[in-house]
Amino acid sequence: MTTRHPSEHVPDLIEGRGAPAALDRVAAMQQTQAPAPNGPFTVRPISMDQLEQTLLALGGSFLQTPAWAQTKPDWRRTALGWFSSDGDLVGAGLVLSRNLPRLKRSFAYLPEGPSLAWASVAEDPGAWIDPLVAWAKGEGAFALRLGFPLVSRTWEPEIVKKQISEGGLMSFTSLDPTSDSPAARSLEAWLDRGPWRPIGWGNTAAVGQPRYVCVVNLRDRSADEVLKGMNQQWRRNIKKAAKAGVQVRTVGVEGVDTFHDLYAETAVRDHFFPRAKSYFAQMVSAFGPGTEGRVSAAIYEAHVDGDVLASALMVRVGDMFSYLYGGATSRNRDARASNALQWQAIQDAIELGCSAYDLRGFNTSLGATSPLTGLLLFKLGVGADVIEVVGEREIVLNTFW
């Protein structure tokens, strides 16, 4: 167990975000690969160790890790590799498959994956995706769903906050982006011409993984620079937490009970349906203790004299540090424990050399008075950009079940 003060020396409030350009923020979330591998490509099963090594080399989601596979015992789990014409392993993905009752057909799913050289994929999508489709057909899948992680567009936080304050954010399609990726547009055009239908577009209550996420760029930025990128209220709250004596510590599976109590309290307060405690215990155990490992998880607790006021589950995968779930009590809210917790996690991510702090998704249809708007504003206040990815698409492989 590690205990820290959220900030021993918080600099004076300084106006301005001090953040790099939007394209640099995109690079912080997704690296481009060069030179491009040589096709044609083939896919075949690989070991879980090979999957993890490839994911760490190319970058990828926690949902594509062998650790995540361990949290899905009811699914068939396959580590799949992409091989170049030279026989080199150039990509990998975790395929989760689930059989239909009484039928010899399955649903195949790669959440937020696979991990590929996506800049190269966008140049010739069929060369990369068609071998996967053929493999899934051969495995008896009736449908295949992919979470295409290529960054499409970005919005700076001020743009989104301004739109919300002026009457609500009904759709990101009507909001001019800070950056727009030609590679993503090319990939989307290829998908639209084919049988790939979009899944879960719109708010995050829909099925599937979020298409819009909030990400703080950490690449080549110090903790002070990230702090300057937060809004004034966030910086004030970090100072308040320090004055209130809030300390932040990291714990393992032993922190699940307290975490779930706070998470469940938050669910009642914010009107969402909470996951079972066993889900979180399984996740922390699967990813392993702490966040020092390249693939690992920890529960962060913000407390005053041992009274835990806020708790959050964090996962690290390579250069990405992700805030997955959190909860806070209504007790002693003036201590600003949630701000202290997030600030400490960001500082830890910087110390670990991570390039991005991922605050995950949000509801994308928000009015100024929506109960979920506060969560988005909380994420924007920390200096997070809104990142849109190409998102989830599904193809039907066999209609004759």
Identify the meaning behind each predicted range:
Residues 117-121, 268-271, 331-334, 365-368:
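A generic structural signal for short coil/turn motifs at secondary-structure boundaries
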Residues 130-131, 281-400:
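Aromatic (often tryptophan-rich) hydrophobic motifs at membrane interfaces
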